[in-house]
């Protein structure tokens, strides 16, 4: 006998034992052996063991161990649980499996909720979430709210908001109460191309039962971001809609919206700020690539969270680059063109790119997309009507005035009308359905501004900035275009100015605390974040944010890396 061998062992038979135990208990139940409780629903009797039911349900445990009368009874009657649902739950108690379908879930979930069987309740909610579509999401949302299924309620609400344009054409939408409708259209995350969609949805809901519902018009209209509607639309609304024209409160709301367009001093009031919050407003900043030194081209990417004033690193670019364009479309970050550098023996090679990369926040990965028709660095990029526009720039030999747009549906770049002049190192912005090309170099420093009208496929000059600028930041909020920092050909700038399209006028605002060129700028919650750049003596990672209401600057947490001539966007 080998005395070195262990004299004992611990056999782990947990899985086999559990399986055997469940099978044995289930056989006892099926044969009505050792059963000590009968659950009765109508004329149906379900035999079971108290200890098994109590082990999976706090409800049953309280019933069989507490001071309730059922403790001593051998039969309990249920009047508020569906027979098939109770059968399914008892089956689950003995087998660990439960059948969930569209036919059973509406009775099974309330039963699991009443009996406090969390695992079954969780699976029912997961099943309903997988079944969400425009025709049932409102009903599922109500169902979840009734039974306190918080996560399912949030998922259904998110689905409603993301698919609002389809949801507002369904029967469930027209059967909403005015309070439920008001809650939906007040949501900041409503996914609509324009605020007109929200108004038309409300109008359709009211016309579904106009006699009963027209009394809610003013209350509901107050949830529409009316200042985000065009002057033309607001005017036509007043002229063509007698329900609005005949209601004093509605007329007042329309007049206030028109003031926003014609009286710019009203835009900086607190109430106007609330009424002009964009739907699906950006919540985080994304800083991409750039330079951190004379020959240091970055591929790193980082994200800023205003809630806790902090930055984290993300997946790097496929190609290190700087002086590129950046934008967000369908919650994906597009990085377009720019300069790639590579080091060869005794020299640094600069390549002007026509390549495009796209970052998916769901997977934290970068993928390549279709290349532009032309190589472009120091270009302007913006999204207009669901298409990505790439403007001007420099191809390594010439300054460009050409413009092309990327159409996601056909995955192609197509040319559009060129700008009136060549521009590089400039900024592009979209406001009120128009595309602006601002400042830049071509081949002199410029303060000129031109505007593209997509309906005419043509450009026109508008009022110039006060300062000439290259490599500056731009942001749009409260109906204004803000430009900040840059270089005027002589010195680095700390100045900021805003453009009012209705007055066709630029106004100088309070300057930054320090000058910056090659700076990034983006808007979150009506703050203009100004990030990184070069001060004239050093590369920066510092961040300031501008509050247009108080015309003041505040400090925020700095980036992980110093960056200049990089991409910054909000999403």
UniProtKB/Swiss-Prot annotation:
Each Kelch repeat, start to end: 284-331, 332-386, 387-433, 435-479, 480-526, 528-570
Domain BTB, chain residue ranges per copy: 35-102
UniProt key word Repeat: yes
SUPFAM superfamilies: Galactose oxidase, central domain (SSF50965), POZ domain (SSF54695)
Cited InterPro entries: BACK, BTB-kelch_protein, BTB/POZ_dom, Gal_Oxase/kelch_b-propeller, Kelch-typ_b-propeller, Kelch_1, SKP1/BTB/POZ_sf
Pfam families, per the entry: BACK (PF07707), BTB (PF00651), Kelch_1 (PF01344)
Origin: domain of life: Eukaryota
Keywords for this protein: Kelch repeat, Repeat
Name under which the protein is recorded: Kelch-like protein 28
